[in-house]
Amino acid sequence: MMDLELPPPGLPSQQDMDLIDILWRQDIDLGVSREVFDFSQRRKEYELEKQKKLEKERQEQLQKEQEKAFFAQLQLDEETGEFLPIQPAQHIQSETSGSANYSQVAHIPKSDALYFDDCMQLLAQTFPFVDDNEVSSATFQSLVPDIPGHIESPVFIATNQAQSPETSVAQVAPVDLDGMQQDIEQVWEELLSIPELQCLNIENDKLVETTMVPSPEAKLTEVDNYHFYSSIPSMEKEVGNCSPHFLNAFEDSFSSILSTEDPNQLTVNSLNSDATVNTDFGDEFYSAFIAEPSISNSMPSPATLSHSLSELLNGPIDVSDLSLCKAFNQNHPESTAEFNDSDSGISLNTSPSVASPEHSVESSSYGDTLLGLSDSEVEELDSAPGSVKQNGPKTPVHSSGDMVQPLSPSQGQSTHVHDAQCENTPEKELPVSPGHRKTPFTKDKHSSRLEAHLTRDELRAKALHIPFPVEKIINLPVVDFNEMMSKEQFNEAQLALIRDIRRRGKNKVAAQNCRKRKLENIVELEQDLDHLKDEKEKLLKEKGENDKSLHLLKKQLSTLYLEVFSMLRDEDGKPYSPSEYSLQQTRDGNVFLVPKSKKPDVKKN
């Protein structure tokens, strides 16, 4: 045989290519081009696709490396969960000032940031627990004077004001203490350069300045030269939009409280009593007692003002005093709008709100009874006699036994006029909702309430002026219905509506009858099922009794069998063995002693 050279299995032969060329010329609509059958062309496309895939993988790898390098420069914030750039350790530069209260600290550059262990070691080296470096108690007592007992709260010294010559001379410290202070500043610089403490964002200007206190030999009268720490500079941004008149009144009243001739007037009772006052009324009392100096030109004495302030903060709060506050002022419409429907027991000499019921318990119980009803049922209850409550006058409820008097004659007159208007309101007028100022228009309410109970067929029959009721159209027999229809003349629309009403009514009645029959059948089946269950229980009970009696009979029979078998004897007078013999009874009633057949023993090979 001749060996034929076969082309590789993956490559088409020349004969196949010629056949494909012939077929393509005969039918161009093969759906594919000739390049598809060209293996070299397909191989080039495969190599090109492979190169694109490798290039794509290379780009993805490069992007992953860039992301890895980018995230290496970030740190995760544990509080917010976002990535933040790692900030290098920045050294805090201290500001230099000409004042004696500020110390000059030179900037110490650091090549590497200190960590916590290095910092602790540096602290141990700087402040060793040795008696040589400790300051003696006498030196400490000479530097730190005793604070007078009448000054309970710490008083800060204003650093932006010039000090007296005696104070500046008294603040001169020994040389060794200056060196220790510089060491402390240097340690603070190194502490704040730790990366773990960068999140604190502590600056030198926010740190508490350490100032020297004059020795006890200085006169106690120098307290008058000090200026108490005022909260006005910190409030300049908040009260910047206020008028100068208000700021002047604030400064006068605040300075009159603090700038006293005798420091003993700053008692603990007056300083700490503001802790017992509710913070909700802080701004109200604040505006109340600072407005007095602006009204009168004469300033009260410091002792009287301190005594009145302590009484105001420690004494019981009167309801009439609260009416001065803006939250209880009747002249503010925004505050009165919030308490239109208030159920509070405190009466502030204001008229009852028209929008709310006279008693909240009555309104809540009335609303609960109407909660599960439909709109039509609610309207029926509204229209029923006795359902509308009579708005009689009621005595207002107060928290105290005395009546609260109005603050001014004009204000009291306005409230009395408003009460008179509320009493003269007609009783038949419906209560309005909180968003309305007038009573709703109720002219057509009765007719709409009646139409709400009509069905769709009744409304259509009423619109076409059909003189017969819908129930009569549906329920009349055929003869009576035809006789009724012959007595009247109807147009096509009326006839079509009457037929439609009767047809749908009959269908409805038929459906109701069908459902009724189905329900009756279901009830009958339930009764049959209950009867079968009772019969089953009865049969099971009888079966149990029969089984019990049968078991008793078997027991009696076995007892009789053993008794008869024990009475039998052989020729020798010996009893028969029950394992070898048995008693059997024939149909005629005779009993025979039959030996039991023994099975022959089969030996297994």
UniProtKB/Swiss-Prot annotation:
A motif (DLG motif) lies at residues 29-31. Widely expressed. Highest expression in adult muscle, kidney, lung, liver and in fetal muscle. A motif (ETGE motif) lies at residues 79-82. One of its GO terms (biological process) is cellular response to fluid shear stress. Residues 416-430 have a biased composition (Basic and acidic residues). Changing R569A: Loss of function. Residues 334-449, 571-605 are annotated as: Disordered. Heterodimer; heterodimerizes with small Maf proteins. Interacts (via the bZIP domain) with MAFG and MAFK; required for binding to antioxidant response elements (AREs) on DNA. Interacts with KEAP1; the interaction is direct and promotes ubiquitination by the BCR(KEAP1) E3 ubiquitin ligase complex. Forms a ternary complex with PGAM5 and KEAP1. Interacts with EEF1D at heat shock promoter elements (HSE). Interacts via its leucine-zipper domain with the coiled-coil domain of PMF1. Interacts with CHD6; involved in activation of the transcription. (Microbial infection) Interacts with herpes virus 8 protein LANA1. The ETGE motif, and to a lower extent the DLG motif, mediate interaction with KEAP1. This is Nuclear factor erythroid 2-related factor 2. It comes from the Eukaryota. The lineage of its organism: Eukaryota, Metazoa, Chordata, Craniata, Vertebrata. Residues 334-354, 579-588 have a biased composition (Polar residues). Residues 591-596 are annotated as: Mediates interaction with CHD6 and is necessary to activate transcription. Keywords: Acetylation, Activator, Cytoplasm, Disease variant, DNA-binding, Glycation, Glycoprotein, Host-virus interaction, Nucleus, Phosphoprotein, Transcription, Transcription regulation, Ubl conjugation. GO terms for molecular function: DNA binding; DNA-binding transcription activator activity, RNA polymerase II-specific; DNA-binding transcription factor activity; DNA-binding transcription factor activity, RNA polymerase II-specific; molecular condensate scaffold activity; protein domain specific binding; RNA polymerase II cis-regulatory region sequence-specific DNA binding; RNA polymerase II-specific DNA-binding transcription factor binding. It is linked to Immunodeficiency, developmental delay, and hypohomocysteinemia: An early onset multisystem disorder characterized by immunodeficiency, recurrent infections, developmental delay, poor growth, intellectual disability, and hypohomocysteinemia. Some patients manifest congenital cardiac defects. IMDDHH inheritance pattern is autosomal dominant. The modification N6-acetyllysine is found at K596, K599. It holds the Pfam family bZIP_Maf. Residues 497-560 form the bZIP domain. It is found in: Cytoplasm, Cytosol; Nucleus. Residues 522-529 are annotated as: Leucine-zipper. Changing K472A: Loss of function. Residues 499-518 are annotated as: Basic motif. Belongs to the bZIP family. CNC subfamily.
